């Protein structure tokens, strides 16, 4: 695969060109990135070290934390580096790698959220058959679908964008390489390509969102026959998941289900779904899940006891 242009690098304008603001941006996003990574490590260590969290539901949560950490790592380190050193140039291949990473991990996360909704449906509506339905083979198959779906989605996007001729300005008014800013720099008519890309991203977003809505409608209908305590526990789990779904899908639909014109609000929206949401996900699932909180307390108590010895 070979691109048809002589463009070797792009210039990312970032969030601001004000030196004082760049220092503030460096501190803020460095803290956000540290919280994201620490949240991922905390969740994975807690689930791995706690036998009570060995169900597929918590395995999916560990995968979600891993994907969030990777998703945030695609753009956040670059933004931090650019804010600290003022380096704005990014090589063409580096830009394409960013685009691929964004859509690989973003696509995988969208599919995983749908898988988690199915898992919640089975746990709430068919509790006696949960471990039979969500056996190791099914879990492995679903995780395979998550990764292959993300890879296929990202590959389609990168094949479209890599072949575009770039022969004019190379300045991107964004803090990351993304489809819409790149389409605006192409030296050709990109109208049909915009439709293909919107269809690809839109299909992923809308299909997963529709499946999620159906899952939760069925879950809510089935809760009418459950006890009050069971309803409260199920709703607590579902509210956490629905919150994460809204935080992830609404910004993505806003960005990718419209023409490629770049809007001033795009940077803020991109920050939200590529950095803020991955940071919030571990907090949302931990604070809303009694089993996770108890497991973290036990893990901390165990470390305190071993430290005293």
UniProtKB/Swiss-Prot annotation:
- Superkingdom of this entry's organism? Eukaryota
Q: Where in the cell is it found?
A: Cell membrane
Name the GO cellular-component terms.
Answer: plasma membrane
**Membrane spanning stretches:** 24-44, 47-67, 104-124, 142-162, 203-223, 237-257, 267-287
State any single GO MF term: G protein-coupled receptor activity
Indicate whether Transmembrane helix appears among the record's keywords: yes
Report whether Transmembrane helix shows up as a keyword of the record.
yes
Positions annotated with a glycan in the UniProt record: 6
Query: Which residue spans belong to the Cytoplasmic compartment?
Result: 45-46, 125-141, 224-236, 288-309
Q: List the disulfide bonds.
A: 95-177
The record's principal subcellular location, in a coarse class, is membrane
Q: How does it sit in the membrane?
A: Multi-pass membrane protein
The alphabetical list of record keywords is: Cell membrane, Disulfide bond, G-protein coupled receptor, Glycoprotein, Membrane, Olfaction, Receptor, Sensory transduction, Transducer, Transmembrane, Transmembrane helix
The chain's Extracellular topological domains, given as residue ranges, are: 1-23, 68-103, 163-202, 258-266
Q: Which InterPro entries match?
A: GPCR_Rhodpsn, GPCR_Rhodpsn_7TM, Olfact_rcpt, Olfactory_Receptors
Q: Which family does it belong to?
A: Belongs to the G-protein coupled receptor 1 family.
The free-text function statement in the UniProt record for this protein reads: Odorant receptor.
User: Which protein are we looking at?
Assistant: Olfactory receptor 4C46
Per the UniProt record, the source organism is Homo sapiens
